């Protein structure tokens, strides 16, 4: 099947690999012949807070998911928000979540300043957990949900009954 773009970028921390990550990657593979996947380095991810899995673990989990994909892909470490999207003219599109869409706009501003063609930005909605709140690595780390978005524990107070 011919896909719309020759080279597509997608990036993230990919901590606690979850259903939202799968959705993001599946969209990149749906539209791209070759998908370049950037995974934030330990140093870059440290700015997001504590408890993030080491880059080696995150890349291993990602590779396990990608193993069965019928597409050409490359996984690389990201030391900044942009990776090679601002230095490689060959990229045609970037797949992002609503949360990371502003970074894609920054990438396009840098590409424009360098005389590169802007990337088509493909934005996907966040994937909600069973409680209707988006799945996130933070929620998984807190023990609220599992990687598929199923509720693990109720938030304190949500189970309290009003005393009469």
From Swiss-Prot:
Record lineage: Archaea, Methanobacteriati, Methanobacteriota, Methanomada group, Methanobacteria
Membrane spanning stretches: none
Record pathway: Cofactor biosynthesis; coenzyme A biosynthesis
Keyword presence, NADP: no
Protein name: Phosphopantetheine adenylyltransferase
Gene3D superfamilies reported in the protein's UniProt record: HUPs
Gene: coaD
NCBIfam families reported for this sequence: cyt_tran_rel (TIGR00125), PRK00777.1 (NF001985)
Organism: Methanothermobacter thermautotrophicus (strain ATCC 29096 / DSM 1053 / JCM 10044 / NBRC 100330 / Delta H) (Methanobacterium thermoautotrophicum)
Family recorded in the similarity comment: Belongs to the eukaryotic CoaD family.
């Amino acid at each position: 099947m011919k896909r719309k773009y020759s080279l597509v970028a997608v990036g993230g921390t990919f901590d606690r690999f979850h259903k939202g990550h799968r959705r993001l990657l599946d969209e990149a593979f749906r539209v791209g012949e070759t998908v370049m996947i950037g995974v934030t380095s330990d140093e870059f991810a440290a700015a997001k807070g504590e408890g993030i899995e080491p880059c080696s673990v995150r890349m291993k989990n990602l590779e396990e998911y990608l193993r069965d994909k019928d597409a050409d892909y490359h996984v690389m470490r990201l030391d900044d928000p942009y990776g090679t999207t601002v230095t490689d003219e060959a990229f045609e599109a970037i797949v992002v979540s609503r949360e990371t869409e502003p970074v894609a706009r920054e990438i396009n501003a840098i590409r424009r300043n360098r005389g590169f063609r802007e990337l088509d930005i493909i934005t996907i909605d966040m994937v909600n957990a069973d409680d209707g709140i988006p799945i996130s690595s933070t929620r998984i780390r807190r023990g609220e949900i599992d990687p598929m978005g199923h509720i693990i524990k109720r938030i304190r107070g949500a189970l309290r009954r009003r005393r009469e």
